[in-house]
Amino acid sequence: MGSKTAENESQGGGNAPPSSTKATATGGEPRGAHWSRDGDGTLGEGEGDDDADGDNTSCAPAVPLNPQTAPSTNSKKRKKRPKKKTSALKQSSPPRIPLADLFPDHQYPHGEAQVYEPGLENVARTTADEVRHHSRHHIEDDTFLNDYRKAAEVHRQVRRWTQESVRPGQTLTEIAMGIEDGVRALLDNAGLDTGQGLISGLGFPTGLSLNNCVAHYTPNPGQREVVLDSSDVMKVDFGVHINGWIVDSAFTMSFDPTYDNLLAAVKDATNTGIKNAGVDVRISDVSAAIQEAMESYEVDINGRTFPVKAVRNITGHNIEQYRIHAGKSIPFVKNNDNTKMEEGEIFAIETFGTTGRGYLFDGPGVYGYGKDPSAPKRITSHLASAKSLYQKINENFGSLVFCRRYLERLGVESYLAGMNNLVSNGYVEVYQPLMDVRGSYSAQFEHTILLRESCKEVISRGDDY
């Protein structure tokens, strides 16, 4: 889930001209080079062989009876059928089998471990740095890591189903609810009872942003129903949390090869950002590498060639418990931010590329809401509906971002006046869709990484991206 920067906020070198199109770039590849390897961001067939399912079990030849010990009776002896191997439990489609049933030992797959770039000086820390580091010691805790890896595996299995099953003609509501129902089923937590949503669930509303809508669109009650078209480019952005620690990962789907290079540019830029991220790395260095990779691509649409531009006023971000945007931002363009990444931090490394202007504005409607983490536990308000709604938010979402669909799923009614009161008093922040110019197309790829002591773990990495 991208973090929008304040309007007109300076990002240092953000006004520098985009780098020219070229065959190679830092972390980049020539235009179109990815597609012989990466495909279009969707999962391939590669399921491997199915020998383990027991279907190919061979029968051992029967051993003849020893004539000396064979019984003298002529009665026929019933042959025992060979036992079939128990087939491994596989995820259903749509995904509904709790992950704990698929992993009975409750040990979940590790993310991709990347070594830090050589030459980084990771030992010279100030006292303040050491204090912050010790406050993040949980990142090496086995229970924390296993829970976080479980959330990542839930994300992988649900997005695999999404990539295999979502097709033009489906409504965005149908797609969003399929993703969200899958997440809840795999976590074995419907989230309907008070407090359940704080234990595990969706990290934020499922984003399904089409074409020039770059980010932060989710279908909500009262909106016009949108049907996915074969010409659409759809960003799919959803989060899975356990105990408030959110795995934030996103990908882009298209059904027309016209947009392959757009997807390739953004996927390359995201992987370049991951490669350059690390302990004690300056954010400005990561941003510069992202922009250089992204803007080395162009895309041909209807006979016109468009450079792929890095979006300038939305960023990657660090993640803290129950906070999807925790304060540090990673722009996708050159800047003068000398803030460093630190050991023990968690980052959502994401990039957005567009054929449009690369500057976003608020679109119509509402994506979701999020309680200000610094807001008080209880409020005083002359509006009873505002107080009861605020209590409902605290009990079910805390500071997690949520949407109207989630409120109505909990049975909350007549909440708009109370919500407007909470927003106007600064207790709750409202998020709107973010748009580029009409007629443009945009893409997004995103992973969550943990800056551990010995490596950076790309916890959401999968075979797909």
Curated annotation (Swiss-Prot):
Reaction(s) catalysed (UniProt annotation): Release of N-terminal amino acids, preferentially methionine, from peptides and arylamides
MF GO annotations: initiator methionyl aminopeptidase activity; metal ion binding; metalloaminopeptidase activity
GO biological process: proteolysis
Entry's cofactor comment: Binds 2 divalent metal cations per subunit. Has a high-affinity and a low affinity metal-binding site. The true nature of the physiological cofactor is under debate. The enzyme is active with cobalt, zinc, manganese or divalent iron ions. Most likely, methionine aminopeptidases function as mononuclear Fe(2+)-metalloproteases under physiological conditions, and the catalytically relevant metal-binding site has been assigned to the histidine-containing high-affinity site.
Residues that, per the record, bind a divalent metal cation 1: D237, D248, E446
Entry's EC annotation: 3.4.11.18
Skewed-composition ranges (Basic and acidic residues): 31-40
Positions that bind substrate: H216, H325
Main location: cytoplasm
Region: Disordered, residue numbers: 1-100
Record InterPro entries: Creatinase/aminopeptidase-like (IPR036005), Met_Aminopeptidase_Type2 (IPR050247), Pept_M24 (IPR000994), Pept_M24_MAP (IPR001714), Pept_M24A_MAP2 (IPR002468), Pept_M24A_MAP2_BS (IPR018349), WH-like_DNA-bd_sf (IPR036388), WH_DNA-bd_sf (IPR036390)
Leader peptide range in chain numbering: none
Cofactor: Co(2+); Zn(2+); Mn(2+); Fe(2+)
Binding annotation for a divalent metal cation 2: D248, H317, E350, E446
Keywords on record: Aminopeptidase, Cytoplasm, Hydrolase, Metal-binding, Protease
Gene Ontology CC entries for this record: cytoplasm
Localization of this protein: Cytoplasm
Summary of the function given for this chain in its UniProt record: Cotranslationally removes the N-terminal methionine from nascent proteins. The N-terminal methionine is often cleaved when the second residue in the primary sequence is small and uncharged (Met-Ala-, Cys, Gly, Pro, Ser, Thr, or Val).
NCBIfam families linked to this entry: met_pdase_II (TIGR00501)
Protein name: Methionine aminopeptidase 2-1
